[in-house]
Amino acid sequence: MASLSTPNINNTTFVNSKTQLPAVKVHLQKCYVGPWLNRGSKHMFTNYQFGHRQISKVAKYQASPDVVQVCDKVEHSTAQSFELVDKKIEDNIRYVKELLNSIDDGHISVSAYDTAWFALIRDLDGRDCPQFPSTIEWIADNQLADGSWGDEDFYSAYDRLINTLACVLALRTWNVHPEKSEKGISYIKENLHELEDAEAENMTCAFELLFPVLLKRAENLGINEIPYDAPIIKEIYNIRDTKLTRIPLEVLHERSTSILYGMEGLENLDLDWQKLMKLQTPEGSFLTSPAATAFAFMYTKDENCLKYIKYILDKFNGAAVDVYPVDLFARLWAVDRLQRLGISRFFESEIKDCLSYVHRFWTEKGIFSGRHALFHDLDDTSMGFRLLRQHGYDMDPNVFKHFQKDGRFHCLGGDMSDSLTVTYNLYRASQTQFPGEEILEEARNFCYNFLQDRAARNQLVDKWVISKHLADEMRTGLQLPWYASLPRVEARYYLQHYAGSGDVWLGKNFFRMEDISNDKYKEIAKLDFSRCQAQHQFEWTYMQGWYESSNVQEFGISRKDLLVAYFLAAATIFERERTKERIVWAKSHIVSRMIKSFFTNETTSLEEKVALLTGFEDNINGLHKITSAKREHEHVDILLATLHQLLGEFDEYASHQLKNAWRVWLTKLEQGEAGAEAELLVTTLNICAGHDIAFKEDILSQNEYKTLSNLTNKICQQLTQIQNKKVMETNDSNSIQDKEIEHDMQALVKSVLEEAVGIDRNIKQTFLSVAKTYYYGAYIAAETIDVHIFKVLFEPVI
């Protein structure tokens, strides 16, 4: 990418704000707002009529990596036609739909460690051979070139050593494939020392319990080549002994805890199997762990355990996985990724099915990664709570009280350390707070402080997932709270942060989740973003022409103001087919500012104000048509002509509704009632969006709609005051006002997200979308906004 620094467009003044990205600057070329955007080209427009100009439904070029090249080559077609891009997107969408529709209990990579535990099960008829020979075949076929087993693409000493030791045990137990076991033993001996310097964050789950058990079994088998007296092994044993003293056996036997997941690590303890068998899931597993279930079967020969083991082997072609089912985890994280990448609209029915499925297994204590686990974790519960609430489900926030202890929130019972991603997911969930939900306020404060502290100390590594850009994702999430998060800004940054298939999940070994970490998701998102971005760039071309022809600058509104207005529209309503809504959003914002500027200008006479209002009424009633400007009322005629052009671009029914909305706003403006611009914008957008089927005129008079309008107007008026102070370089923070805005935003979120009764959910969502743009403008630094404008509208996606 070319040298990036913040664009100083039209000498914009940059001031401090409560939320600001790192001091990254973007120097844009002249083409950012230059003449190239005003050029006409036969390649630029296709047959979409809007306001007597043509705006392309699908723009005919894709922005190049260099901004200068965009200037020079804007009229050149890309090497890859948009038809091919569309086909590629459609093919990938079809693939993802098939993936989501076949998600079943979740797609997860095979685990060498768990397969080895299955291989250790002796023949049920008493013969000296494995009960499941397919596991031995899998182990023999999947040894890596260096003699180890484990994740081939991401190296970690923990993952490789525990997988290799388990597989060596399986081969030596049945005295098969001696050359492979010898090679594995050599690997262990030569690489054991790497544990001394291995990153603790990459330690696999329960390693300090599981590795000693495997070592003991190896020693009992007479595998003497391993240096059992090595300092690192002694250290691991000491850690194990310390941890075992903190595991109360009475609790282990009484209720389902996270310890069950690594129960094979308790092999040498006095376990009461009669009590433990009561903690099985209905599927027969122990906390959805194949290895733990295999361990239990060795001691109990329980039929339900055997049924679960056979199910796993059948599902994964003779091998095992780290954890199964992962049906809830897979569905929730898949939905989250699709939403953040900005492509969820392609999978609405699949997402609906996923969330409906998750809700079926929701309990008052939350959920786990797999159904029927008799155990609940904060990570899945947080993700589930947020997504279900955002999709209209009635969710009780008191579910989080089960994870709170001594002022902190923990993922699993008995957790000794906090997880970065778990805390971040709780933080995201807490931002959907409704009024009076104190537990979510406590959660948000705890999470924000925890994450800020970790960020300040540059400790942004997680114990559950290894993701290349996780630290950047966390920082961006802290800097852009949900109230100020615009869909296209979020998608643009998440495209940078999402690693696709490069994500590695940490269980008792490393595993991959195709439903969650999928390169197809990213490919669709990149192609779609570029496609939409090209469309937005041509719309921006049109908007600049409109700016000139409408004499907007005469009302003190700069081209930069127009750019920000269009950006807010495009960052919120980004889909290619919604050109009309974006244009109307930007125009309505600018025209209302023009009229408001006219009304509040000291030089505007009462006669001129009356002339504007009378002219508008005459125009509505068909008694007057703008034909030419009278010199004594030049500004009045400019405003009437611009407003007439804006309202005349719709069919008769929509135009009638829009004229009424603008009449209401003008009346309020005349009466000195400030802050109704948000209501005007919402109503305009809902009419323009085609909600007129459900958007009957009587809806405007319904109490729910009035409540939403009044609340949105109040919020946006206060946010405008904050934004004006920011522009005027004043920094007199008003904590009382901030708290009032926070409370009102919570009330608005509640009204919008609760299940729709009288008003269509899409109509209500427009109120929140508009309010979020005001929140964004008030609390995000001007310098940061310029970076976002560049990234969303102009910077190519690489």
Curated annotation (Swiss-Prot):
Entries under InterPro entries matching the protein: Isoprenoid_synthase_dom_sf, Terpene_synth_N, Terpene_synth_N_sf, Terpene_synthase-like, Terpenoid_cyclase/PrenylTrfase
Targeting presequence: 1-25
Keyword Chloroplast: yes
Enzyme Commission number(s) of this protein: 4.2.1.174
Reactions catalysed, as given in the entry: peregrinol diphosphate = (2E,6E,10E)-geranylgeranyl diphosphate + H2O
Lineage: Eukaryota, Viridiplantae, Streptophyta, Embryophyta, Tracheophyta
Motif DXDD motif location, chain numbering: 377-380
PANTHER family registered for this protein in UniProt: COPAL-8-OL DIPHOSPHATE HYDRATASE, CHLOROPLASTIC, ENT-COPALYL DIPHOSPHATE SYNTHASE, CHLOROPLASTIC
This protein's UniProt keywords: Chloroplast, Isomerase, Lyase, Magnesium, Metal-binding, Plastid, Transit peptide
One Pfam family from the record: Terpene_synth
GO biological process: gibberellin biosynthetic process
Single annotated GO MF: isomerase activity
Parts of the chain that traverse the membrane: none
Pathway linked to the protein: Secondary metabolite biosynthesis; terpenoid biosynthesis
Chain positions recorded as Mg(2+) binding sites: 377, 379
Domain free text: The Asp-Xaa-Asp-Asp (DXDD) motif is important for the catalytic activity, presumably through binding to Mg(2+).
Tissue expression summary: Mostly expressed in trichomes of leaves and fruits.
Binding site for substrate: 243, 463
Listed name of the protein: Peregrinol diphosphate synthase TPS1, chloroplastic
Similarity section: Belongs to the terpene synthase family.
Job of this protein: Involved in the biosynthesis of labdane-type diterpenoid including cleroda-dienols, and peregrinol lactones and furan derivatives, dopaminergic diterpenoids that can bind to dopamine receptors in the human pituitary gland, have probably ability to lower prolactin levels, and are used to treat menstrual cycle disorders (e.g. premenstrual syndrome and mastodynia). Terpene synthase that produces peregrinol diphosphate from geranylgeranyl diphosphate (GGPP).
Domain of life: Eukaryota
Cell compartment(s), UniProt: Plastid, Chloroplast
Organism: Vitex agnus-castus
Cofactor: Mg(2+)
Record's GO cellular component terms: chloroplast
